């Protein structure tokens, strides 16, 4: 029985990892535009970084819901390191959106925690 439950649970993983969701605000910002905003230090850079910080906050909130779970990813992530991480990601993945970068960052941060 335990083996059946485990197989069922593992079969759900790809569905969770590829879930579609509505992206609002700066998450629709394409990576080349983020890199340009970084180079010019425009207001769009700050709104983009704030959007990603909110995304991380939302993930932490969602993770904390089950019975007061203490899941705080990105605890040591500074705004300066976030700006650099996003630029590196966007340079390597110019076809992606800021939301894709945020998702990749969450995966990386979860692996570290």
Task: Annotate each language-model stretch with its function.
Residues 1-4:
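Positively charged n-region of N-terminal signal peptides that target proteins for export
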Residues 7-14:
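Bacterial N-terminal signal peptides
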Residues 17-21:
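Boundary at the C-terminal end of the N-terminal hydrophobic targeting segment
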Residues 22-88:
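Short N-proximal segments of mature Sec-exported proteins
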Residues 76-113:
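Surface-exposed, polar helix/loop patches in the mature regions of secreted/periplasmic/lumenal proteins
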